[in-house]
Amino acid sequence: MTAAFDRYVSFKNADWEGKSQRVMERLQIHIDAAQNPFWAYFAQKRTELNQKQGLDDLRVLHNYLPTLREILEDNGDQETLAMLEDLEVTCM
């Protein structure tokens, strides 16, 4: 009998789901503002990756980490950038 694999076992007590959700909530502000074409693309890819490939938001954020970091820096959104960096250090 094979045990189910949990790739997030090392994140126990790291609240990766909560941290991912809070970062996504902050990013939604940028998506709604639609000041950069990337945000519409990112929102579409998030939906596709979540629904079609079964990837969670932590994986979606990881896939776009360099681009997100650059855009958040350019926008001066230090709060979301700090949240994203914390997520990267503790959970990626």
From Swiss-Prot:
Q: Coiled coil where?
A: none
Keywords, ordered alphabetically: Nitrogen fixation
Function description = Is required to sustain N(2)-dependent growth in the presence of low levels of carbon monoxide (CO). Probably acts by protecting the N(2) fixation ability of the nitrogenase complex, which is inactivated in the presence of CO.
Concerning InterPro entries, the annotation shows: CowN
Which cysteine-cysteine pairs are annotated as disulfide bonds in the entry? none
Provide the species name. Rhodopseudomonas palustris (strain BisA53)
Keyword Repeat included in the entry's annotation: no
Q: Hey, which family's this protein in?
A: Belongs to the CowN family.
What Pfam families does the entry give? CowN
Q: What is this protein called?
A: N(2)-fixation sustaining protein CowN
Q: Which domain of life is it from?
A: Bacteria
**What does the record list as GO biological process?**
nitrogen fixation
| Cross-referenced NCBIfam families | N2Fix_CO_CowN
